[in-house]
Amino acid sequence: MAVQQNKKTPSKRGMHRSHDFLVAPQLSVEQTTGETHMRHHISPNGFYRGRKVLKTKNDE
């Protein structure tokens, strides 16, 4: 098992942990329907960047 040779200082420990935070998801509003969805994902009603790309159960 690996064992550190020297103790890591509080500064280095903080730098090591600097990217361990949680980030809120990026949300976007669909321009045709006004529905909120995650960026670069299809909205729940099947639209992506203003175009219908997926058939849903509610389609006729």
From Swiss-Prot:
Q: Which domain of life is it from?
A: Bacteria
- What's a BP term from Gene Ontology annotated to this protein? translation
InterPro entries linked to this entry: Ribosomal_bL32 (IPR002677), Ribosomal_bL32_bact (IPR044957), Ribosomal_zn-bd (IPR011332)
Q: Which GO terms describe its cellular component?
A: large ribosomal subunit
Which SUPFAM superfamilies does the UniProt record give?
Zn-binding ribosomal proteins
Keywords linked to the UniProt accession: Ribonucleoprotein, Ribosomal protein
Q: Which NCBIfam families match?
A: rpmF_bact
Protein name per Swiss-Prot or TrEMBL: Large ribosomal subunit protein bL32
Q: What is the lineage of its organism?
A: Bacteria, Pseudomonadati, Pseudomonadota, Betaproteobacteria, Burkholderiales
